[in-house]
Every structure is written in C-alpha cells, then in structure tokens.
Amino acid sequence: MQRRHFLQKTLLALPIIFSGNLLTGCKTNLSDDYLPDDKITNNPNLLQNKLKEILPIWENKFNAKIGMTIIADNGELSSHRGNEYFPVNSTIKAFIASHILLLVDKEKLDLNEKIIIKESDLIEYSPVCKKYFDENKPISISELCEATITLSDNGSANILLDKIGGLTAFNQFLKEIGADMVLANNEPLLNRSHYGETSDTAKPIPYTKSLKALIVGNILSNQSKEQLITWLINDKVADNLLRKYLPKNWRIGDKTGTGSESKNIIAVIWNENNKPYFISLFITQPHDGKSLDFKNQKDEIMAQIGKEIYPFL
C-alpha cells in the first residue's frame, strides 16, 4: 500500500494536534508551543505535587527507583528523578522508527523498500521477522517500523538500525533532537543496562522533550508525524500499562520497554479536550536488590501510577 493512501485512510482516526495543513510538508506554521526548542518551565503545580506525593510511596514499597516526566502542550513540566539515568530498553525503538521517518523525509530512504530477512536477523523475540523468513517473503521498511513499535520486534529494530547507518549515525540523531543519551548496543544487549549507568539509559526530562519534539515539533514532516502517531496508537503490547485505566474518550500512543529489573514507557496522551501530554515513566530496581514482588507487579505499578495522575491531566 502506498504511504499516502495509508495515511489518508488513518487520518480521521487520529487526534488533531497540528495547526496548518497536515500534508503540506515539513515547515508549516506550527505554534511556538510545539517547537522542539520550546521553553520548559518548572513552575509548581498540582501535578508536580502529586508526583512528589505518590512516587516515593511506590519506591519505598518495592525498593525501586521511579523516574517520571510529564510535559503539557504549553510546556509546563512536572517530574520526579527527571535528571537521573534509567534503562531505556525497547522504548528506544520509537526513536529508531523516527530516525527512519526523518531519512524518508530527506528522500534518503523509501518506506516501500523491500528487505530480505536473513537467519542471522532472527534474534530473541523477533516474531515478525521469523514469519517473513519462514515464508521466504521480503518485508518493507514500513512493515519493519510497524513491527518494531507495535510488537517490539527485536530483529526488526536491528535491521532498521543498520538502514540508519548503525549506532554512530543513530547517536548523532539522538544528539540533534536533544535526547541527551548514548545507545551503546543494539538488541538484545541494550536491555542489560542498569539504573545510574550512562549508556543505554536516558534521563526522563530530555527523553520526554525529545518525544514531544518528534510528535509536534518541526523535526519530521506532518506526514511522518502522522505515521509515527499511528504506529504508537496501534501498540499491541501495552494494554496492561498506562492504557489499563485510561479514562473513557481519552487517546494514547505509546512504546514500552522491559528489562530483567525494569519496566518503562513513553507515551503521548490526549485527554477528553484533545490536549496532549507527553510522558516518560521508568521503574527499576537496583540490580543488587531484586524483589519477586516487584517483578510480578511492575506492570500493575505502572498502571496504578497512571490511574493516580489522570485526574490532574
């Protein structure tokens, strides 16, 4: 299916977050609130107070560290441990797909380009790659991006990293969008990072600012932003997390990540007034203090945190 035809079919299902014509290219008249270099304020607010109230309780209960940042569409920022390093795990896949979209905008890649899956691509948890390999069928870059975000397919993510130009090129992209992090490994090794380390980890504040910049800033064309939103909304492995208690008539697009001692998510949530909030939530335990209760309940911890903060969005 051609990219434009796909977008036309999905456009009406998406939240409206842009100003100007949605399909007229990269440099449209977006409001100042939506620029990637917007001024983030740290004014005290009810949401900030709520984070400071509830997150230490969860941390103490499970001997965990929780990093969370929420940025409203007007730039107001609320955060807990926002400048501490947390494992990114598979949340980074949303940024990998975003880099692909940027290269498409620059006409350096084509989403319709077909790739042959090799046996060496079939690393741990690569269901989509395995399907195409078993059927001896080529897969498009668009399908690889979809698999990477909606099913967190590891092999797809690694193939896309290769198309980008490897970790060096991807880290340059992360630097340019202000993510303030370094990815040192691809899948599955990137999941072995720990809280406080400085590779394969991110700080919630710059990570969330970068997410906002990709979705409503002027880094990507409006077509690419719509495509990214579509993939995030169609995430198929996140129902038990922030989606679980999402209020009726709200919308969410997200990308999850899981490690042996961590759970994390990045998301954009639109409330009933279609106002977007950009969120990063990282939950981890020190690798010398693992708890079986934490391992079994980290999904529900994340869901409950969402339930507690939704009244403030």
Curated annotation (Swiss-Prot):
Using the record, list the residue span of the signal peptide; answer none if the entry has no such feature. Answer: 1-25
Q: How does it sit in the membrane?
A: Lipid-anchor
**Catalysed reactions, as listed in the record:** a beta-lactam + H2O = a substituted beta-amino acid
Record-linked Pfam families:
Beta-lactamase2
Q: Which residues carry the N-palmitoyl cysteine lipidation?
A: C26
**SUPFAM superfamilies referenced in this protein's UniProt entry, alphabetically:** beta-lactamase/transpeptidase-like
The protein depicted here goes by the name Beta-lactamase BRO-1
Q: Which organism is it from?
A: Moraxella catarrhalis (Branhamella catarrhalis)
Give the source lineage, highest ranks first.
Bacteria, Pseudomonadati, Pseudomonadota, Gammaproteobacteria, Moraxellales
